């Protein structure tokens, strides 16, 4: 879809209902990981009669933020944080990623570095910056990225990477980035939605 609004929660949840209708399925168990989990948590709030269960891997249900999430991201991480940058009406991040498709997947599809020997309990090192504000400036990271200087191990074979590169060379990144451009809209339009009355089970792993 060409419009930003086509990627908001109402449309994405509606797409899942449309898929179920196409498959003649009255109910489904939805399993989502990371950002996909956020979409699936919308289902029992927006379409409760179509939901047999929801599993969020890495994404528990969060209550509605007390303020516009874009402003919260900006306050905590600064203007260079990738989600904040994605709001740019000039769509500069789309251009950066779209003109460096192979670089983008070279950078993101790698294993993190192991913790230093003197700090065995430290979190893995992603290798893209020294601080949160630097780590999250993804457009600038990709613009300056050179795989020759990246010590991390790729997680994709050349054949697997080619699938991603060929696909995004054809489609561009705007559709995916439009997901982030709906954060404010989703927040504005989710007032009154509540999952706390439903049966939920949180399992930490």
Where are these regions (language model features)?
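Flexible "cap/lid" subdomain of the alpha/beta-hydrolase fold that forms the substrate-access gate
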Residues: 2-31, 35-205
